[in-house]
């Protein structure tokens, strides 16, 4: 699988890259201050099969070209957003992002999750790493909530457009079954005929 990862200037970015490489993916990293046409041209040229939005500081609307890229990518190729990327997915699709009830930085918490969803295949118990003060406060139309912690959305998916958001950090050692989660995410996101959609 060919992945393009949009780097939102986060220290966890290359942890994600390493995990994807261990799963056999080819990963190219592009920063969010890269001009949008440059990223679009690269995605079209190399047959990218998944766009990944990294974690990062601040708010999604301040993260370079990320929201514009999402508007272009929607319906064209699958997207996986992690932490800030998860929030950007929601905002770009018409959802809302607000303050978390309690900021969490470097904390491991348990999740309540939908065990029927392929993201959680083979996972019975799950504790995840959380580094955030913002959450998705309103789910966008077309998205399903897959997991929550104390009523706050921790994972969501748009099955029609193959967009998946994780508020937590699967690449962190504080997350149990992190590599399995990423493998399941790749399998779920990779089910589209991506190249045909990119040409549309």
Swiss-Prot record:
GO terms for molecular function: anthranilate phosphoribosyltransferase activity; anthranilate synthase activity. Disruption phenotype: Single disruption in strain PA04290 results in decreased pyocyanine synthesis. Double phnA-phnB deletions are tryptophan prototrophs; they make less PQS. Disulfide bonds: none annotated. GO terms for biological process: L-tryptophan biosynthetic process; phenazine biosynthetic process. Transmembrane segments: none annotated. PhnAB is not feedback inhibited by tryptophan. Part of a heterotetrameric complex that catalyzes the two-step biosynthesis of anthranilate, a precursor for Pseudomonas quinolone signal (2-heptyl-3-hydroxy-4-quinolone; PQS) production which is required to induce the genes for the biosynthesis of the virulence factor pyocyanine (PCN), a characteristic blue-green phenazine pigment produced by P.aeruginosa. This is Anthranilate synthase component 2, pyocyanine specific. It comes from Pseudomonas aeruginosa (strain ATCC 15692 / DSM 22644 / CIP 104116 / JCM 14847 / LMG 12228 / 1C / PRS 101 / PAO1). The gene is phnB.
């Amino acid at each position: 699988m060919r992945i393009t990862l949009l780097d939102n200037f986060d220290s966890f970015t290359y942890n994600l890259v390493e995990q994807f490489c261990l799963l056999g993916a080819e990963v190219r990293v592009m920063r969010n201050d890269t001009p949008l046409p440059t990223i679009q041209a690269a995605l079209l040229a190399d047959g990218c099969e998944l766009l990944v939005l990294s974690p990062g500081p601040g708010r999604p609307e301040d993260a370079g070209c990320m929201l514009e890229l999402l508007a272009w990518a929607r319906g064209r190729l699958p997207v996986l957003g992690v932490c800030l990327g998860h929030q950007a997915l929601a905002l770009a699709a018409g959802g809302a992002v607000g303050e978390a009830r309690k900021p969490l930085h470097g904390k491991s918490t348990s999740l309540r999750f939908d065990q029927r969803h392929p993201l959680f295949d083979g996972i019975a118990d799950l504790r995840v790493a959380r580094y955030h003060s913002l959450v998705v406060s309103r789910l966008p139309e077309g998205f399903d909530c897959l997991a929550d912690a104390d009523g706050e959305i921790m994972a969501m998916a748009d099955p029609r457009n193959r967009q998946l958001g994780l508020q937590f950090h699967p690449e962190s050692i504080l997350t149990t079954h992190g590599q399995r989660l990423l493998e399941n995410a790749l399998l779920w996101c990779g089910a589209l005929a991506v190249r045909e959609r990119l040409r549309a």
